[in-house]
A protein has these predicted regions:
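C-terminal cap/linker of serine protease catalytic domains
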Residues: 23-30, 39, 73, 88, ...
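Conserved active-site neighborhood of the chymotrypsin/trypsin-like protease fold
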Residues: 45-48, 58-130, 134-138, 152-156, ...
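Catalytic nucleophile loop of clan PA
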Residues: 55-56, 144, 163-183
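Conserved structural position within tetratricopeptide repeats
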Residues: 251-254
Length: 257
């Protein structure tokens, strides 16, 4: 009798699980959609040279995205719903981890809630809100499949939630609707290998007040930095693409012997 009851309950849970996940995705999207933005980088001719995603962490326009999204930018604009916000400058630059915090000219913006990756568990459900391939604010879901150590004190998150070009800088949420990661890298040569930087890297940086003007920030081409090639080499290694990993590491050494 107990076995029958257990099987019945287990079957009911299996039937309900997809509906529960869909409900979570719908709730998370509705709660956070307005706090996820499109980030567009422009050159000195005012032509767009890069586009990615970002998320708002302060009502006055502090926005987190990837450094590579704004590579070589002379001007940056943020599309938040039907508003286009001009970026005044940068509050924080972390080239090593491919993270930047922008400061847009804004007030009373909706914000996301930040979680703690130290409390995350492998296998837990995650949701990514981003703008892949220019499709504004779409949501995808998957699991947190790994927390990897690139080097001493550097961690990355491996997720199965589908992401595409344009998703970089997007928010990775847990089931509680808290951001635990920043969608950062896709290994296109390997199926379902997507990586995110832990949100803990920026939690103590979002209160920064000093704005660095774009012209003084020294924004360079991320692909011309050793940090880019070192990180790429690590990701290739995780994907089993050892030849590509070696070449990436060699390039990192060429740039920074």
């Amino acid at each position: 009798m107990k076995s029958y009851l257990f099987l019945t309950v287990h079957l009911i849970l299996l039937i309900l699980y997809p509906a529960i996940c869909l409900a979570d995705a719908d709730r998370i999207f509705k709660e956070n959609n307005r706090a996820v933005v499109v980030v567009i980088a422009y050159d000195k001719q005012d032509k767009p040279i890069g586009q990615g995603s970002g998320f708002i962490v302060r009502p006055d326009g502090a926005i987190v995205t990837n450094y590579h999204v704004i590579s070589n930018a002379v001007d940056i604009k943020v599309k938040a719903g039907d508003k286009v916000l001009k970026v005044e400058g940068l509050l924080h630059i972390d080239r090593e981890n491919d993270i930047v915090i922008l400061k847009a000219d804004a007030k009373n913006l909706p914000t996301v809630k930040l979680g703690d990756i130290e409390k995350a568990t492998i296998g837990e459900k995650v949701y990514v809100i981003s703008s892949p391939k220019g499709l504004e604010n779409t949501i995808s879901d998957g699991i947190l499949s790994g927390i990897r150590e690139i080097s001493d004190k550097r961690k990355i998150l491996q997720i199965t939630a589908p992401v595409s070009p344009g998703s970089s800088g997007g928010a990775v949420f847990n089931k509680n609707g808290e951001v635990i990661g920043i969608a950062t890298f896709i290994i296109e040569e390997a199926q379902n290998l997507n990586f995110a930087m832990p949100v803990n890297l920026i939690k103590d940086k979002i209160s920064a007040k000093k704005v660095i003007a774009l012209k003084d920030a020294g924004i360079e081409d991320y692909k011309e930095t050793a940090d880019y090639w070192f990180t790429l080499g690590y990701f290739y290694g995780e994907a089993g693409l050892h030849k590509e990993a070696i070449e990436a590491y060699k390039q990192a050494i060429r740039i920074k012997p």
